[in-house]
Amino acid sequence: MANINRNNLGAIGEHQVLSRLLLLGYQAAITNMSVDNMENIDIFCRDSQNRYAAIQVKTTLANDINVGINHRKFFDDNGNVDLAAGLEYLESKIVGPWVMVQVSGTDSDPLFKFFIMSRKQVIEMIYDSERWYLTDFNRKKPLSGNGGIYLPIPWLYGNGVVANNNHKEWINPFSGHSFENQWQNLWND
């Protein structure tokens, strides 16, 4: 695929999700069309039962999803790991379900994969993987809290990470469960 700037990539993902929601029979609108870059919400959606979802869309060309949060949120002011503070931050920032879009293929024949997680599932996945990353690695020097948090695409298929000399095993809290095309997760919490 050609070099796509970040804003265009985000718009591509949002429009693909919007199209899919409309095809599924939902009423949906991209919030950024009427509200200037509404934080944490990209699409409002309503189903036939008048349930609403405030959806965050994350789009990638890579094999992982940048969740838009850095490790610093899981540290206290003294630089110590503070998982409770990280969880509190996740619960305040993540306001609804997420649809993660992986774009591949070519410019003339793009392919889109959709991974749908409820708000609760997103929080649990990020929290548990961050707990593992911050506490179950053999590090010679402590982390500074810099750097972004990513969810590798294999994790969205329910895969974990085997132990090695650098870290303990990470057992995916959704082991064996694929989030691909799980649109019903929009309505779960």
Predicted regions and their residues:
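Mixed-charge (Asp/Glu-Lys/Arg
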Residues: 1-39, 44-189
